[in-house]
């Protein structure tokens, strides 16, 4: 145990940068948050200004320490968690970006992805990187910058330009250009990293014409990478000692560090990750294979599945359908009826993600009869989030052969007790909701704290992890399967809607 009293987690997200100060009992002492500009140069293109990312993140660090009235010499370490896949390319000499950050949501590299498919790279990419060919991942974004900024590829070959995901960019700035690193979890989202050899993949670098000289060193998620003196009063150099991409940080924050443990984050969409231990499981059900953190930040593997519409479907009830005036009201109205009266809502507004991967599916409401009212539709919309989660979990169990015993949950929608109970009912599994909801920041703090001895081991952290509420299945297996079969029938009818229309 150190005499330093606090850990700071920097949580660099897609729309805001946050700093969270935690004490030795993993209690939150102070939080600072700043939003920054979203740049949309063309339809489907999304950018951030890397200097604004840096300015917003560094100012939240200073603010969070000032709010808590803490000197930098009281901080044991800083941990970083970040929006994944987003790309920055900058000059080694000046630290100046040569282009805006291209954000994970940006679709501009769709044609590069199509070319990779035409070149027969799809199967290799799945096996080597664990990913599917999609503009979502970093590699094609780096290629796009090198293709479109004059002279940049030659400069990169000469070692004048550097590439990094957001974690790498922040650490470069925090250490005044002394440290150029990333961690295994972020590297595994680039489509440039071989998740089996744990090294940058030469075949992928050649395919995208990306010089190796511009890539960061890849390190464990929990170790000291460098020191920073940013943070206001005290002037002491603070170790930067933890890095993980946001979903992997949440998995670690939920202490899902053993094979078969899983968490689901309920945000705009859902991200479910299951730790598969030391073996990388190749999915045959449309899931991603990715790197997660083991008990000491070492490499573990995970399966990841994404649901596109979770919280977004509740926003649709509020903003477009005007059935509720606040997202929190959905629980109240859903519990005014005893069931959905046979209604199923399939919220495939932008197609369906894992395990269907059908961009042509469209949203639909099935089972309407004269007795159906708005409460039934609200309830069915909430239930659709739980059904989609079961779809992903079934794919995970089929790929891994692991039976889930409990699902840990986080994100905005977990405050909805009706949804959490129905989730448990439809999975036939315990659902555990933690007391501390800031699990992404918690994961980054844990990784940093373990690296510097602020916490000794995971047993110490387990003692601090309080499950605020546990939901247990309250329906019989026959009822569960009957309801789920109705969902599957509804999804089947919503698939390929657009294609059917065009035929």
From Swiss-Prot:
Regulation: Activity of this regulatory enzyme is affected by several metabolites. Allosterically and non-competitively inhibited by fructose 1,6-bisphosphate (FBP) and unphosphorylated phosphocarrier protein EIIA-Glc (III-Glc), an integral component of the bacterial phosphotransferase (PTS) system.
Keyword ATP-binding attributed: yes
Chain positions recorded as sn-glycerol 3-phosphate binding sites: 14, 84-85, 136, 246
UniProt-listed Gene3D superfamilies: 3.30.420.40
Binding site for ATP: 14-16, 268, 311, 315, 412
Ligand binding (ADP): 14, 18, 268, 311, 412, 416
Reaction it catalyzes: glycerol + ATP = sn-glycerol 3-phosphate + ADP + H(+)
InterPro entries: ATPase_NBD, Carb_kinase_FGGY, Carb_kinase_FGGY_CS, FGGY_C, FGGY_N, Glycerol_kin
Pathway stated in the Swiss-Prot or TrEMBL entry: Polyol metabolism; glycerol degradation via glycerol kinase pathway; sn-glycerol 3-phosphate from glycerol: step 1/1
GO molecular function, one term: metal ion binding
Binding locations of glycerol: 84-85, 136, 246-247
SUPFAM superfamilies (alphabetical): Actin-like ATPase domain
PROSITE patterns the UniProt entry points to: FGGY_KINASES_1 (PS00933), FGGY_KINASES_2 (PS00445)
Family: Belongs to the FGGY kinase family.
Protein name in the entry: Glycerol kinase
Naturally occurring in which organism (per UniProt): Klebsiella pneumoniae subsp. pneumoniae (strain ATCC 700721 / MGH 78578)
Gene: glpK
């Amino acid at each position: 145990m150190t005499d330093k009293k606090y850990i700071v987690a920097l949580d660099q997200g897609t729309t805001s940068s946050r700093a969270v100060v935690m004490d030795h009992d993993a209690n939150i002492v102070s939080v600072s948050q700043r939003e920054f500009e979203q740049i949309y140069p063309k339809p489907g293109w999304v950018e951030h200004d890397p200097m604004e990312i840096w300015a917003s993140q560094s100012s939240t660090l200073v603010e969070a320490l000032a709010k808590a009235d803490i000197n930098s010499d009281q901080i044991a370490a800083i941990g970083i968690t970040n929006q994944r896949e987003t790309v920055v390319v900058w000059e080694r000499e000046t630290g100046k970006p040569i282009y805006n950050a291209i954000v994970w949501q940006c679709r501009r590299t769709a044609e590069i992805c199509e070319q990779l498919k035409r070149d027969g790279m799809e199967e290799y990419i799945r096996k080597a990187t664990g990913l599917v060919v999609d503009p979502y991942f970093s590699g094609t974004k780096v290629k796009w910058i090198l293709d479109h900024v004059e002279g940049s590829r030659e400069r990169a070959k000469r070692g004048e330009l550097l590439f990094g995901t957001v974690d790498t960019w922040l650490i470069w700035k925090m250490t005044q250009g002394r440290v150029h690193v990333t961690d295994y979890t972020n590297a595994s989202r680039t489509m440039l990293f071989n998740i089996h050899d744990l090294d940058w993949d030469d075949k992928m670098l050649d395919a995208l014409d990306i010089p190796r000289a511009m890539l960061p060193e890849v390190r464990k998620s929990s170790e000291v990478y460098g020191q920073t003196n940013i943070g206001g009063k005290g002037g002491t150099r603070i170790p930067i000692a933890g890095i993980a991409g946001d979903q992997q940080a949440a998995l670690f924050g939920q202490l899902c560090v053993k094979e078969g443990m899983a968490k689901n984050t309920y945000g705009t969409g859902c991200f479910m990750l299951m730790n598969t231990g030391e073996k990388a499981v190749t999915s045959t059900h449309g899931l991603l294979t990715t790197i997660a953190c083991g008990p000491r930040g070492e490499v573990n593997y995970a399966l990841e599945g994404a649901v596109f519409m979770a919280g977004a479907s509740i926003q649709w009830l509020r903003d477009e359908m005007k059935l509720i005036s606040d997202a929190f009201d959905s629980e109240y109205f859903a519990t005014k009826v005893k069931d959905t009266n046979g209604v199923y809502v399939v919220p495939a507004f932008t197609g369906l993600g894992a395990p269907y991967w059908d961009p042509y599916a469209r949203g639909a409401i099935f089972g309407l009869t004269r007795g159906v009212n708005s409460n039934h539709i609200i309830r069915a919309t909430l239930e659709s989030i739980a059904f989609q989660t079961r779809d992903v979990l079934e794919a995970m169990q089929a790929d891994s052969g692991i039976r889930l015993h409990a699902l840990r949950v986080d994100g905005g929608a977990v405050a909805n007790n009706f949804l959490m109970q129905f989730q448990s009912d439809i999975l036939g599994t315990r659902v555990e909701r933690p007391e501390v909801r800031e699990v992404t920041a918690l994961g980054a703090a844990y990784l940093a704290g373990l690296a510097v001895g602020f916490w000794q081991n995971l047993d110490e952290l387990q003692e601090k992890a309080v499950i605020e509420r546990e939901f247990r299945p309250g329906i019989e297996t026959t009822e569960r399967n009957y309801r789920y079969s109705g969902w599957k029938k509804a999804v089947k009818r919503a698939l390929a809607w657009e294609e059917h229309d065009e035929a």
